[in-house]
A protein has these predicted regions:
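Compositionally biased, intrinsically disordered low-complexity segments enriched
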Residues: 197-219
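Non-transmembrane, aqueous-exposed alpha-helical and coiled segments at domain scale
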Residues: 1-198, 217-434
Length: 434
């Protein structure tokens, strides 16, 4: 069994979806494993001839080639959003994707999303740059002891699930609202209790778009406060996720189950520089491990190890969201770089930002740090020291830049990067196949 991890080298948006799809299409009997974050990923795959284009959020990139997806127990699926993604996928490709999930994967709830959106709105100019998909709030809720697993959601009745969500609101969410500074709009404080007693009079929440522009509101006027006190929001959530959980086949993904596959492709969300422990860019990070950490633990539990880690980068750097971006510049200052069709301007992350790579040393540093991080797992009591995987850096979109990478110190030919990587034990490539 061959095991491969696909990882973003920078801040995300490097071409991980393209890479996973290429691997899945060329390797026999593959399984795509989603292992970090949740529904906030946006991995784009396009047909080489331009016949179709699809953005994968939770469905593995490569599912278009009939390759199944597994949600590992460290993945936090957003079952509220999954239904639409499966519908769009099925309409485009003509078949429903095969989706497995470990039974103890922890779901993201509607209140996680609303808390996330409300917190970002309350932060104003100090936003973290979140996607607004509730991952940090899902992590916090689980840490407080209020988790809900996929198996629980699947086996509970609608009423059981609704009761559990109400309990979480009563015992936990109210405290979290205060911590995050999400306050009721002054004009609606008197209406709040009325809406709770009579949910039919409250508006139905929608998380597909932001209901207001943040520049209009302050901490004292946060529309998400009302939604977090609206029982109809929970009722609609329960109805949707109880239907969407039927799209998953729950499995015990032990070694015996995995042996039906010849290749395991670990599709990682975000990028190394957004890892929850990459202090340099705190607090503008994601609430998950974005390197080989989760993969190493998953495999070690099953007596397996990681064979290869592929770190994906563009010839330049992008960042979608707030936070430091060294060597930042306007896209027009990067010759040949075209518009990004996936990362469109939005309320939560703003406009996609561009930069040059800092230096050769900084270019390789995150990969070396990630490689060395697995040596720490034994000291953390999480796993034995694994065999180190083969390391590769895949540079995508070199056709935009004439086979060179843009660095602050000047443009560097790809071949020069290759030679520098060889000295560090890292293979640099510009194409990926089986």
């Amino acid at each position: 069994m061959r095991t491969i991890a696909v990882i973003g080298k920078n801040f995300g948006d490097e071409g991980k979806g393209f890479t996973c799809s290429r691997l899945a299409s060329s390797l026999k009997k593959s399984l795509i494993i989603k292992h970090n974050g949740g529904g906030q990923a946006g991995h784009t795959v396009e047909d080489p001839e331009g016949k179709w284009r699809f953005i994968h959020h939770q469905i593995g990139a490569g599912a278009e080639y009939h390759v199944p997806t597994l949600f590992a127990d460290s993945f936090m699926p957003d079952l509220f959003q999954l239904g639409k993604e499966v519908k769009d996928f099925t309409e485009l490709f003509g078949f429903q994707p095969i989706l497995y999930s470990e039974k103890n994967a922890r779901i993201t709830t509607i209140d996680d999303v609303l808390l996330n959106m409300g917190a970002e709105l309350a932060r104003g100019k100090n936003r973290h740059g979140s996607c607004g998909m509730g991952i940090e709030e899902c992590v916090q809720r689980n840490a407080a002891g209020y988790g809900i697993t996929v198996e629980e959601l699947a086996t509970w009745s609608n009423q059981d699930l609704l009761d559990r969500l109400k309990q979480i609101r009563k015992e936990y969410t109210g405290r979290r609202i205060k911590i995050l500074g999400i306050q009721a709009p002054a004009s609606s404080k008197a209406m709040k209790q009325s809406n709770i007693r009579n949910p039919s009079t409250a508006s139905t929440a929608s998380t597909s778009s932001n209901p207001t522009n943040s520049s209009t509101f302050s901490n004292l006027s946060n529309p998400y406060y009302e939604m977090l006190n609206n029982e109809t929001v929970l009722e609609n959530f329960v109805e949707e996720v109880k239907e969407n959980v039927k799209l998953l086949t729950l499995v015990d993904a032990d070694r015996k189950w995995l042996e039906q596959f010849q290749h395991l492709i670990f599709e990682t969300g975000q990028g190394l520089l957004l890892d929850q422990d990459y202090e340099t860019y705190a607090p503008h990070l994601t609430s998950s491990k974005t390197g080989i950490h989760n993969t190493a633990i998953f495999l070690d539990k099953r007596g397996l190890s990681l064979d290869e880690a592929i770190y994906v980068t563009r010839p330049y750097v992008t960042r979608h969201g707030n936070g430091p971006l060294p060597c930042e510049m306007d896209r027009s200052e990067l010759p040949g770089v075209g518009e990004d069709l996936t990362n469109q301007p939005n309320e939560w992350q703003g406009t996609l930002r561009y930069a040059k790579h800092e230096s050769l040393e900084a270019f390789f540093a995150p990969v070396l740090r990630d490689r060395d991080s697995v040596n720490c797992l034994e000291r953390m009591g999480e796993t034995k020291r694994p065999d180190l995987p083969k390391l590769a850096i895949l540079v995508t979109q070199l056709s935009e830049t004439g086979n060179q990478l843009y660095f602050d110190e000047g443009n560097i030919p790809f071949e020069t990067i290759q030679k520098a990587g060889e000295e560090l034990g890292i293979s640099c490539v510009k194409d990926i196949g089986g």
